[in-house]
From Swiss-Prot:
Source species, domain of life: Bacteria
SUPFAM superfamilies in alphabetical order: YnzC-like (SSF158221)
UniProtKB keywords: Cytoplasm
Family stated for the protein in its record: Belongs to the UPF0291 family.
Upper taxonomic lineage: Bacteria, Bacillati, Bacillota, Bacilli, Lactobacillales
Protein name as it appears in the record: UPF0291 protein lp_2062
Length: 79
């Protein structure tokens, strides 16, 4: 989960960059924080997709096979 502190610091650096610019140290920190944010975002998104089940109008499950396989590997499916 993405922490409020992480987002607050990213936003703080973004505002400072627009207002007066960043030092090299702050620029490096901003890049590191962005990478951490993206890593956490992708992990959360992947988890949501892996828990997803898709059904058509007739009630038949049409979840993509790749997602089904990941769910089987993690013990989330019985089929």
């Amino acid at each position: 989960m993405i922490s409020k502190e992480l987002l607050a610091r990213i936003n703080e650096l973004a505002h400072k960059a627009k207002a007066e610019g960043l030092t090299e140290l702050e620029e490096a920190e901003r890049q590191e924080l962005r990478q951490k944010y993206l890593k956490e975002f992708r992990a959360g998104f992947r988890q949501q997709v892996e828990m997803l089940q898709v059904y058509d109008k007739d009630g038949k499950e049409v979840t993509p096979e790749k997602v089904r396989q990941v769910q089987r590997d993690r013990g989330l499916r019985d089929d």
